[in-house]
Regions:
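Active-site mouth loops of central-metabolism enzymes
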Residues: 96-112, 136-140, 160-164, 185-186, ...
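Catalytic alpha/beta core domains of metabolic enzymes, predominantly
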Residues: 91, 201-300
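N-terminal amphipathic alpha-helix/helix-capping segment at the start of soluble metabolic enzymes
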Residues: 67-100, 325, 332-340
Length: 340
């Protein structure tokens, strides 16, 4: 349920209504726009008489929200959310960003790759220090040492870092190392203890869609994080598992405009994991930009044939240079704000 207040509603009136609702045992989510203020009611709304709420002087109207996701719902928050990722980088609304770097942090080559992707125009650095792998015998990541290398690259280049967290017990480690953006990978999209734990922080969370997850399940995963108090969620479409075997996954670009319609949260697209092959990354990156994504996450490695993981889908730095030039050209046409 949402209460849409009149434009004349004062701060005191808003506080009074919020207090009245919370005394009924519900939580509230207040969204202030240019022309209206919306109070979202979260919890058992059967405790609230909508006609009584609507009779209050400053309430314009009351509307029920049928979707199970509330805080992530655009009806609760009509204006696009803009997430501050640190180092002066924001994503959402008219802010378009490119996240780039290797699949795995491998060692000193990280800084070489980071310098190249920044020079090409990437604004955020990705790299996995902890790797969820299908096989227990595959490379699992460098762990804390990998986080240290990411932090060193971030400090040198003044770039926010995006790296995956897999275990609720590691949240404090990520906080201590001041990781800018914690990524929840596809395999952990319904790891509810992890979602709740990162929700207790204020660190931005890049939440990937599960391999077989529906759009509603992605939004409900975001709801888990936001229900704990962390509204800094970035959604990521990274491809879903279908009957098609010619690509690693099927890139569901329908999800980008659908998510924008349903939610105020920023939407990033990952053409690397979606396709699984270098040759398809650029065309799908351009398509994702054209259909309204707020950003891209692209894997780049200076020697893909020697990469410790996912080399088949990594662009070389030279390929990334070319791709960024084309992304810029698309962005000049469709993005509200031109890339730097």
């Amino acid at each position: 349920m949402i209460a849409i207040l009149k434009e004349s509603a004062s701060d005191e009136a808003v506080s009074h209504i919020v207090s009245w609702i919370e005394k009924k045992g519900l939580k509230t989510d207040v969204s202030r726009g240019e022309n209206e203020t919306i109070i979202g009611l979260v919890g058992d709304t059967t405790k609230i008489d909508p006609f009584l709420l609507e009779s209050m002087d400053v309430v314009e109207r009351v509307q029920r929200v049928s979707e199970p996701f509330k805080r992530a719902n655009r009806k609760f928050h009509p204006e696009d959310s803009v997430i501050d990722c640190g180092h002066g980088v924001k994503i959402g609304g008219d802010q378009f960003q490119v996240i780039a770097g290797p699949c795995s942090v491998e060692g000193e080559n990280l800084i070489r790759i980071a310098r190249r992707v920044k020079a090409a125009g990437a604004t955020m650095l990705r790299g996995g220090a902890y790797k969820p792998r299908t096989s227990p015998y595959a490379y699992q990541g460098m762990g804390p040492a990998g986080l240290d290398l990411l932090c060193e690259a971030s400090a040198e280049l003044d770039m926010p870092i995006v790296t995956e967290i897999m275990d609720p017990r590691d949240v404090q480690v990520f906080l201590d190392k001041k990781i800018d953006v914690m990524q929840i990978g596809a395999r952990n999209a319904q790891n509810f203890p992890l979602l709740k734990e990162v929700g207790k922080t204020k660190t931005p969370i890049l939440l990937k869609r599960g391999m077989s997850g529906t759009i509603d399940e992605l939004l409900m995963a975001a709801e888990y994080i936001m229900s704990e108090g962390n509204d800094n969620v970035i959604l990521c479409e990274r491809g879903i598992r279908t009957f098609e075997t010619r690509t690693r996954n099927t890139f569901d670009l329908n999800a980008v405009p659908v998510l924008h319609h349903l939610s105020h949260l920023p939407v990033v697209a990952d053409p690397s994991h979606a396709t699984g092959y270098t040759r398809y990354v650029e065309p799908m990156a351009l398509a994702a930009t054209a259909c309204g994504a707020n950003g891209l996450e692209i894997e780049v490695h200076d020697e893909p044939s020697r990469a410790w993981s996912d080399g088949a889908q990594a662009l070389t730095p030279d390929q990334f240079d070319d791709t960024m030039r084309r992304i810029r050209a698309i962005c000049e046409v469709v993005c509200q704000e031109t890339m730097e």
